Amino acid sequence: MDIIIRADAQEVGKEAAAIMAPFIKQGRTIGLATGSSPLTTYRELIRMYESGELTFKTIQAFLLDEYVGLARDDKNSYFRTIRDEFTAHVDFVDANVHSPDSTDPDPYHAAALYEQKIIDTGVAIQLLGVGVNGHIGFNEPTSALQGPTKVQALHPQTIKDNARFFNDCIENVPTHAMTQGLGTITRAENIIMVATGEAKADAIHRIVEGPLTALCPGSVLQLHADVTIVVDEAAASKLEHADYYRTMERIRL
């Protein structure tokens, strides 16, 4: 696990985009995440596209998750969010951006189909954010560390955190989502996690330096052979070995 500490969210985004760019240039499949932390990464990837450094015409992408019951064109769906924040600003083909079928009357069947599609295609590099309780995707605390794509009831903290996207009304937030499982996520060849802000500091500390536990789903990344975590100074503020991580980056061969 490589830990990279940058000054602020903009620098985090630049670093993450630089890590993802070689995979995109090679035409590899990428995994995309929603939330506030990846936004600066998407802005930098858009800049690289506009400058002619990248093209996404042949890239396949898989979304981490989707709310159960929200159509793709709903303003709060994650497919729509990713489109508005990223894919519509580059030359992505909409049909190449995959998400769970959130309107399937049998979400469990839809989750199984999505899992198989990811298995068949594979993901070269997965971009992740992290929740304040250590969740990745919608894998809430106590999620199976090797579980497949699933239907997940949302933790009250997650519902509270996401209410800001639903007119600050908790009652409007869906109670369930389909999410890639922790086993699905960690099948990606490479993983990059981004986190910014003091609110994420405890989760980053637990993921990097805490024990492997289902109570902190992100700690499963300790088992992956190729993980890079890019954080700003605020999100790194509770890391006990921050100076060591800075030194290791500086002397890396």
Swiss-Prot record:
GO terms for cellular component: cytoplasm. Pathway: Amino-sugar metabolism; N-acetylneuraminate degradation; D-fructose 6-phosphate from N-acetylneuraminate: step 5/5. GO terms for biological process: carbohydrate metabolic process; glucosamine catabolic process; N-acetylglucosamine catabolic process; N-acetylneuraminate catabolic process. It catalyses: alpha-D-glucosamine 6-phosphate + H2O = beta-D-fructose 6-phosphate + NH4(+). It holds the Pfam family Glucosamine_iso. The active site is at D65 (proton acceptor), N133 (for ring-opening step), H135 (proton acceptor), E140 (for ring-opening step). Keywords: Carbohydrate metabolism, Hydrolase. Transmembrane segments: none annotated. SUPFAM superfamilies: NagB/RpiA/CoA transferase-like (SSF100950). PROSITE patterns: GLC_GALNAC_ISOMERASE. Its EC number is 3.5.99.6. Disulfide bonds: none annotated. InterPro entries: Glc/Gal-6P_isomerase, Glucosamine6P_isomerase, Glucosamine6P_isomerase_CS, NagB/RpiA_transferase-like. GO terms for molecular function: glucosamine-6-phosphate deaminase activity; identical protein binding. Belongs to the glucosamine/galactosamine-6-phosphate isomerase family. NagB subfamily. Catalyzes the reversible isomerization-deamination of glucosamine 6-phosphate (GlcN6P) to form fructose 6-phosphate (Fru6P) and ammonium ion. PANTHER family: GLUCOSAMINE-6-PHOSPHATE ISOMERASE. HAMAP family: GlcN6P_deamin. This is Glucosamine-6-phosphate deaminase. The lineage of its organism: Bacteria, Bacillati, Actinomycetota, Actinomycetes, Mycobacteriales.
